[in-house]
C-alpha cells in the first residue's frame, strides 16, 4: 500500500492542516516509509506468542465488586443551602 500526493492533500484538508506543495511531497514520502514499516510488522509470524500486557509479570489485586451509596449523603447535601429529605431544593424556574 502506498500514499500518493492527492491522498495526502485530502487527508490534510479533512484534518484542517495547511500544507504547502513542498510539504505535501515530504509527507507523502514519510507516510510511505511508515506504511512500509507497518507492512513489515504485519509479515512477522506471531502465532503462538501470547499478548504482552506488561514487561514485568504482575498480578493485580482485585476487590469485591459491591454496590453501596458511599455513605456520603450527609456530605453531599451539606453543600446545598436548602434541602429536604436528602434532595436539593431549588427555586422554580419555569412556570
Curated annotation (Swiss-Prot):
Instruction: Output the InterPro entries linked to this UniProt entry.
Output: Asp/Glu-ADT_sf_sub_c (IPR036113), GatC (IPR003837)
Which Pfam families does the entry link to?
GatC (PF02686)
Q: Name one GO molecular function term.
A: glutaminyl-tRNA synthase (glutamine-hydrolyzing) activity
EC numbers for this chain: 6.3.5.-
What keywords are assigned to this protein?
A: ATP-binding, Ligase, Nucleotide-binding, Protein biosynthesis
Report the SUPFAM superfamilies cross-referenced here.
Glu-tRNAGln amidotransferase C subunit (SSF141000)
**What superkingdom does the record give?**
Bacteria
Name of the top EC class for this enzyme = ligase
Give GO terms for biological process. Answer: glutaminyl-tRNAGln biosynthesis via transamidation; regulation of translational fidelity; translation
Q: Does the keyword Ion transport apply?
A: no
Recorded catalytic reaction(s): these are:
L-glutamyl-tRNA(Gln) + L-glutamine + ATP + H2O = L-glutaminyl-tRNA(Gln) + L-glutamate + ADP + phosphate + H(+); L-aspartyl-tRNA(Asn) + L-glutamine + ATP + H2O = L-asparaginyl-tRNA(Asn) + L-glutamate + ADP + phosphate + 2 H(+)
As for what it does, the entry says: Allows the formation of correctly charged Asn-tRNA(Asn) or Gln-tRNA(Gln) through the transamidation of misacylated Asp-tRNA(Asn) or Glu-tRNA(Gln) in organisms which lack either or both of asparaginyl-tRNA or glutaminyl-tRNA synthetases. The reaction takes place in the presence of glutamine and ATP through an activated phospho-Asp-tRNA(Asn) or phospho-Glu-tRNA(Gln).
The subunit structure is: Heterotrimer of A, B and C subunits.
* Family to which the UniProt record says this protein belongs: Belongs to the GatC family.
Stated name of the protein:
Aspartyl/glutamyl-tRNA(Asn/Gln) amidotransferase subunit C
